Design a protein with these regions (language model features):
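N-terminal pre-core extensions flanking Radical SAM catalytic domains
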Residues: 1-122
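N-terminal pre-triad scaffold of radical SAM enzymes
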Residues: 90-116, 146-151, 157, 355-358, ...
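Local cysteine-cluster metal-coordination motifs and their immediate loop/turn environment
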Residues: 109-119, 366-369, 412-430
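Radical SAM/AdoMet-radical enzyme domain recognition
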Residues: 119, 131-152, 159-289
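Short cysteine/histidine-rich zinc-coordinating motifs and their immediately flanking basic loops
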Residues: 122, 126-130, 426-432, 437-439, ...
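Short Fe-S-cluster ligation motifs
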Residues: 137-154, 440-472
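C-terminal accessory region of radical SAM enzymes
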Residues: 292-336, 363-364, 369-418
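Short, small/polar residue-rich loop motifs at catalytic or cofactor-binding pockets
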Residues: 348-353
Length: 472
């Protein structure tokens, strides 16, 4: 029997994950790779259309994998030899760890004066990389097998040559998954350009409270611009999400904001407090909510969310999340790890294992939350060293490799905490001190478990759900 890997699939590998099949062309480009064990992958390499494979000689796992890939259309079987693989389908190992997506600041400039900006864009602390630097980043992304970028800034649409970047990304088989924007420059012409080059991203718009948005964004008319952009995206069939930073001036607008966004076509709303980084440092003392005040806002809103018919996907920090139209909610802060778990095998941050952030200076960071921090200033730049190399051997790589056992060895309070198996260490970035020490406990999640807890959230949510269900 002969087997052949169908197009657009190719044999691929990454440093640390060397055995994979992934799509390298067309619409399937969006799909994540399929990873395999060594023995199964070695058998799959014979699926080149020209060498016979005896299914009976395969181990049980490999036979099952062959059948599954045949049913999915990844493989074709034939009793006669077939056309050999195309050159791009042959096995290639990328010189990088596997990066599912890269969050990229294509500029540090912004046309707003946001009071909470992570990268202090209104004050010009960050530059705009040159066009050649951006094109080099795109070439590096392709060389490392990255197929998705999420574009941010500053405000990304202030770049005058976005069209060149959109085209270059498409030419290098990289699609834009999401664009983070303040929406002030989002026009039909921008959407036309994206579609021209084969991109159909979702958009995350900042929307900081109905009737309150302009204050945080620092410019009059910002809310009207966001409203126009939401309706444009809805009209053109582009997905929109919203992010709201909760503070003292907009805390009473949460319910109205969620209902408005749902009506305007946004499918999700993520609510957080502004991080005490960048510009917000000068406003936090007067306008930041205490943790207790934030919990009270969330506690009061959860019943209203259910009363309103769950109008939008929502996440209230780590306290509560729920899908539109569903009562199947979660408490994201809470994990349920087994008592015998080996912490030396658990990453401190699971979420950043296969993602990265590239700053306007080209610095490689685990996520944008590290911007303007000591970690940022100590991190390497892809303008100076190759991305593939930095993904494996750099300060970034050390952060990615940090395990929960490293935290527990340094932080006795965390190691002895009765909530450890529920919190699993919290967030590395949230825990980071002003001098850049990230091997300390996350005070935000500590406060949640010691002062609120899962039971309190569930009591509020369950009572609200019971109130909207028909009485039997």
């Amino acid at each position: 029997m002969y087997y052949r890997l169908n197009e657009p699939y190719a044999f691929r590998g990454y440093k640390g994950l060397p055995y994979a099949i992934r799509a390298e062309r067309g619409g399937k480009l969006f799909d994540s790779p399929l990873f395999f064990g060594r023995e199964t992958f070695l058998a799959l390499l014979y699926c080149n259309g020209t060498e016979p494979v005896e299914p009976e000689a395969l181990d049980v796992e490999s036979r099952a994998t062959f059948q599954e890939l045949l049913s999915q259309g990844v493989l074709t079987a034939s009793e006669a030899p077939m056309e050999p693989l195309k050159s791009y389908q042959r096995y290639h190992v990328y010189p990088s760890r596997y990066l599912e997506r890269v969050h990229w600041s294509i500029t540090g400039r912004c046309n707003f004066r946001c009071r909470h900006c992570l990268v202090s864009a209104p004050d010009g602390h960050h530059p705009e990389p040159t066009l050649e630097q951006c094109l080099d980043v795109i070439r590096q992304l392709e060389a490392c097998g990255v197929h998705r970028v999420d574009i941010t800034g500053g405000e990304p649409l202030v770049r005058r040559n976005c069209d060149v970047l959109f085209r270059a990304l498409s030419e290098h088989r990289i699609y834009i998954g999401m664009i983070f924007t303040n929406a002030s420059l989002l026009t039909g012409e921008v959407l036309d350009l994206l579609e021209k080059y084969g991109h159909h991203p979702s958009f995350q718009l900042s929307f900081d409270g109905l009737g309150c948005h302009d204050w945080l964004r620092g410019v009059p008319g910002a809310e009207k611009q966001a409203d126009a952009a939401l309706h444009l995206l809805k009209e053109r069939g582009f997905a929109a999400t919203a992010a709201m930073c909760l503070h003292r001036k907009n805390k009473d607008s949460l319910r109205d904001t969620a209902r408005y966004l749902a009506d305007a076509g946004a499918y999700s709303l993520r609510v957080n407090d502004p991080q005490a980084l960048g510009n917000w440092k000068q406003y936090a003392q007067e306008y930041a909510l205490t943790r207790q005040e934030r919990w009270e806002v969330y506690r009061d809103y959860i019943p209203k969310y259910f009363e309103d018919g769950m109008p939008i996907d929502i996440q209230l920090d780590g306290y509560f999340s729920c899908k539109r139209g569903s009562t199947d909610y979660k408490v994201p802060f809470v994990h349920h790890s087994p008592e015998n778990i080996d912490w030396s095998r658990i990453p401190y941050c699971e979420g950043m294992q296969h993602t990265a952030y590239i700053s306007p200076e080209g610095r490689l960071l685990p996520c944008m939350g590290f911007a303007d921090s000591p970690v940022d200033r100590a991190s390497p730049s892809v303008f100076e060293q190759p991305l593939g190399e930095l993904s494996q051997r750099s300060y970034y790589a050390d952060l990615i490799a940090t395990k929960l056992s490293d935290l527990l060895a340094r932080d006795a309070e965390c190691a002895q905490c009765p909530h450890l198996h529920s919190c699993c260490g919290g967030c590395m970035q949230e825990s980071m001190t002003e001098d850049g020490d990230y091997l300390v406990h996350d005070q935000e999640i500590c406060w949640f478990f010691k002062n609120v807890g899962e039971a309190a959230v569930r009591a509020v949510a369950d009572a609200a759900i019971a109130g909207i269900r028909p009485q039997v």
